[in-house]
Swiss-Prot record:
Species annotation: Gloeobacter violaceus (strain ATCC 29082 / PCC 7421)
Function: One of the components of the core complex of photosystem II (PSII). PSII is a light-driven water:plastoquinone oxidoreductase that uses light energy to abstract electrons from H(2)O, generating O(2) and a proton gradient subsequently used for ATP formation. It consists of a core antenna complex that captures photons, and an electron transfer chain that converts photonic excitation into a charge separation. This subunit is found at the monomer-monomer interface and is required for correct PSII assembly and/or dimerization.
Protein's UniProt name: Photosystem II reaction center protein L
Subunit-structure text: PSII is composed of 1 copy each of membrane proteins PsbA, PsbB, PsbC, PsbD, PsbE, PsbF, PsbH, PsbI, PsbJ, PsbK, PsbL, PsbM, PsbT, PsbX, Psb30/Ycf12, peripheral proteins PsbO, CyanoQ (PsbQ), PsbU, PsbV and a large number of cofactors. It forms dimeric complexes.
Keywords linked to the UniProt accession: Cell inner membrane, Cell membrane, Membrane, Photosynthesis, Photosystem II, Reaction center, Transmembrane, Transmembrane helix
The organism's taxonomic lineage, starting at the top: Bacteria, Bacillati, Cyanobacteriota, Cyanophyceae, Gloeobacterales
Glycosyltransferase in keyword set: no
Amino acid sequence: MSKDPKNPGVELNRTSLYMGLVLVLVIILLFSNYFIN
């Protein structure tokens, strides 16, 4: 548990967080298209 600001673990966690947000947005778009049609 180093306090290095360039810790790869923090970057990996941030990347996974952004990927999760993108995945949720894609799912919302798919469901909205499904319900509109």
